[in-house]
């Protein structure tokens, strides 16, 4: 079987029983189960949620997105070998560590396969919860242009690129396009301040004003747990994005939980510790792939300028990236996952067939 066959690039065509359209994101696809199947699994599998909780099968792919586009490689390679399994393995590890440290639950109820989560439906907070320990990326770009207020936070003078910040900073942005919020443009990923959230907390999906404090605590506490664990394997946790939502527990109480993935090379910047001490930046995250793209194409402005999206989409669609570049990303992702979890990352030869078999034999969800 070829390398291309081992990559799960299309994940929205599985014959999973559902009565709703499949939701396809950049990397994951979500299959909402029927009410009958949700109730059956909650009962037979003993999931600790109310019997009427809607459940979904969330299937990760090996696709790689950057600058809001999906890229592909030579030889029909439509994704990164091992990427999906690596991302799930890392998130699974951190969620387990969060539970051990008494933090909030996640939306995951079951892990039938390295590419698959069974999740409970949550009511999402419409905030990209971003936490930064070092100044880089968009914060550095703004700072280097003379801006000293970022997401409502005043930054001190004299900071240098990649320097550790005086304290852990929360710099949220909008999740999706939100309309009708004073002072917040109706665009995706717009930087916002805590005061923006406080003044419009219900529009951002918070049920109580005090839950803003809770989300910030869960974000910082989760960041610190991951940062300490990464430091133990000489990796630097630079910055990350978390997502949060509400679920209803068995007693009918609403509670805030972690959603999506946490602490992965897709959602975070991770630097090699030894290289950083030598004054160098060695990326162990998707940031390395972004830098490759900026150097690979002759006009990097296409990738950075939001006004040139049609050109960017054509660039991603019409160019096969070098195989070695794709495999370097594979080595980065699987390498980080193996360091974090202490176990090899399984690379099934035919992941789609494996997923269908497990969901049929063990969950009776295949039509």
Curated annotation (Swiss-Prot):
<comment type="similarity">
    <text>Belongs to the SAICAR synthetase family.</text>
</comment>
<dbReference type="GO" id="GO:0006189">
    <property type="term" value="P:'de novo' IMP biosynthetic process"/>
</dbReference>
<dbReference type="InterPro" id="IPR028923">
    <property type="entry name" value="SAICAR_synt/ADE2_N"/>
</dbReference>
<keyword id="KW-0547">Nucleotide-binding</keyword>
<protein>
    <recommendedName>
        <fullName>Phosphoribosylaminoimidazole-succinocarboxamide synthase</fullName>
        <ecNumber>6.3.2.6</ecNumber>
    </recommendedName>
</protein>
<comment type="pathway">
    <text>Purine metabolism; IMP biosynthesis via de novo pathway; 5-amino-1-(5-phospho-D-ribosyl)imidazole-4-carboxamide from 5-amino-1-(5-phospho-D-ribosyl)imidazole-4-carboxylate: step 1/2.</text>
</comment>
<dbReference type="GO" id="GO:0005737">
    <property type="term" value="C:cytoplasm"/>
</dbReference>
<keyword id="KW-0067">ATP-binding</keyword>
<dbReference type="Pfam" id="PF01259">
    <property type="entry name" value="SAICAR_synt"/>
</dbReference>
<dbReference type="InterPro" id="IPR018236">
    <property type="entry name" value="SAICAR_synthetase_CS"/>
</dbReference>
<dbReference type="GO" id="GO:0005524">
    <property type="term" value="F:ATP binding"/>
</dbReference>
<keyword id="KW-0436">Ligase</keyword>
<dbReference type="GO" id="GO:0004639">
    <property type="term" value="F:phosphoribosylaminoimidazolesuccinocarboxamide synthase activity"/>
</dbReference>
<keyword id="KW-0658">Purine biosynthesis</keyword>
<dbReference type="InterPro" id="IPR014106">
    <property type="entry name" value="SAICAR_synthase_Vibrio-typ"/>
</dbReference>
């Amino acid at each position: 079987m070829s390398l291309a066959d081992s990559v799960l690039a299309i994940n929205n065509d599985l014959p999973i029983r559902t009565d709703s359209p499949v939701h396809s994101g950049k990397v994951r696809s979500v299959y909402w189960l029927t009410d009958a199947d949700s109730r059956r699994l909650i009962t037979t599998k003993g999931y600790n949620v109310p019997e009427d909780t809607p459940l979904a099968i969330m299937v990760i792919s090996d696709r790689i997105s950057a600058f809001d586009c999906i890229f592909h490689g030579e030889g029909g390679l439509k994704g990164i070998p091992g990427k999906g399994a690596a991302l799930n393995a890392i998130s699974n590890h951190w969620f387990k560590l969060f539970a051990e440290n008494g933090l909030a639950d996640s939306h995951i109820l079951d892990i039938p396969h390295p590419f698959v989560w069974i999740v409970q439906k949550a009511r999402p907070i419409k905030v990209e919860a971003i936490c930064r320990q070092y100044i880089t990326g968009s914060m550095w770009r703004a700072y280097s242009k003379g801006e000293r207020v970022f997401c409502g936070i005043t930054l001190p003078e004299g900071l240098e690129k990649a320097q550790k910040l005086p304290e852990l900073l929360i710099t949220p942005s909008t999740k999706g396009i939100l309309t009708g919020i004073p002072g917040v443009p109706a665009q995706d990923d717009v930087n916002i301040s805590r005061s923006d959230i406080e003044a419009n907390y219900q529009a951002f999906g918070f049920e109580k004003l005090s839950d803003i404090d809770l989300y910030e605590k869960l974000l910082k506490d989760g960041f610190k747990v991951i940062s300490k664990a990464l430091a133990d394997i000489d990796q630097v946790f630079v910055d990350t994005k978390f997502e949060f939502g509400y679920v209803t527990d068995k007693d009918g109480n609403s509670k805030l939980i972690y959603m999506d993935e946490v602490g992965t090379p897709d959602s975070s910047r991770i630097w090699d510790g030894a290289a950083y001490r030598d004054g160098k930046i060695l990326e162990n995250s998707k940031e390395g792939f972004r830098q490759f793209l900026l150097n690979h194409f002759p006009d990097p402005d296409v990738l950075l300028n939001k006004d040139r999206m049609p050109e960017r989409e054509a660039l991603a669609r019409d160019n096969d990236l070098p195989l070695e570049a794709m495999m370097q990303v594979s080595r980065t992702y699987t390498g980080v996952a193996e360091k974090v979890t202490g176990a090899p990352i399984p690379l099934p030869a035919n992941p789609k067939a494996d997923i269908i078999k497990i969901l049929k034999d063990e969950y009776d969800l295949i039509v």
